Amino acid sequence: MTRVDFYVIPSADPSARLQVACRLAEKAWRQGMQVYLHCADEAQRSELDGRLWSFRGEAFIPHSLAEEDAEAPVALGLGEPPGNHRDLLINLTLEAPGFVPNFSRVAELVVEEPAIRQAARDKFRFYREQGYPLQDHRLPRI
């Protein structure tokens, strides 16, 4: 069954979620996992795309927009994930997508911004009611 991890970030800045998303994607990619970053909108996806290119100085995380290269180890999308991305879903939307059960793990990133925090509470309740194993991670300041 899919395991859902909530990463609680001590920041009110929604862009802190993108920084943590890059860290998680890099770690998963280095472990050989296929990663799907489910973005809320095109602006968020574009910003995340730029961050992944320059995440660690001259190094970058190999990635692609989901509709451009389904074989990239890290895909950024707005809808259904490419067929081979089933290891880690990093969900940056305010809802739990219907394709959650297709993944081994799901990462939900939470900041102190009221709308994001409330959406996270709603998703936590939803996942718990569906019987998903839940894990809570309190991150240090970034």
UniProtKB/Swiss-Prot annotation:
UniProt-listed Gene3D superfamilies: DNA polymerase III subunit chi (3.40.50.10110)
What is this enzyme's EC?
2.7.7.7
Please name the top-level EC class of this enzyme. Answer: transferase
Keywords of the record, alphabetical order, are: DNA replication, DNA-directed DNA polymerase, Nucleotidyltransferase, Transferase
Disulphides: none
The reaction(s) annotated as catalysed by this protein in its Swiss-Prot or TrEMBL entry are: DNA(n) + a 2'-deoxyribonucleoside 5'-triphosphate = DNA(n+1) + diphosphate
Q: Fetch the InterPro entries from UniProt.
A: DNA_pol3_chi, PolIII_chi_sf
Q: Which domain of life is it from?
A: Bacteria
Q: Which GO terms describe its biological process?
A: DNA replication; positive regulation of DNA-templated DNA replication initiation
GO molecular function terms listed in the Swiss-Prot or TrEMBL record: DNA binding; DNA-directed DNA polymerase activity
Its annotated function is as follows: Part of the beta sliding clamp loading complex, which hydrolyzes ATP to load the beta clamp onto primed DNA to form the DNA replication pre-initiation complex. DNA polymerase III is a complex, multichain enzyme responsible for most of the replicative synthesis in bacteria. This DNA polymerase also exhibits 3' to 5' exonuclease activity.
- Protein family (similarity comment): Belongs to the DNA polymerase III chi/HolC chain family.
**Assembly state and interactors?**
DNA polymerase III contains a core (composed of alpha, epsilon and theta chains) that associates with a tau subunit. This core dimerizes to form the POLIII' complex. PolIII' associates with the gamma complex (composed of gamma, delta, delta', psi and chi chains) and with the beta chain to form the complete DNA polymerase III complex. Interacts directly with the psi subunit (holD). The only subunit of the DNA polymerase III holoenzyme known to interact with single-stranded DNA binding protein (SSB).
What protein name applies here?
Answer: DNA polymerase III subunit chi
The top of its lineage is: Bacteria, Pseudomonadati, Pseudomonadota, Gammaproteobacteria, Pseudomonadales
Q: What gene codes for this chain? A: holC
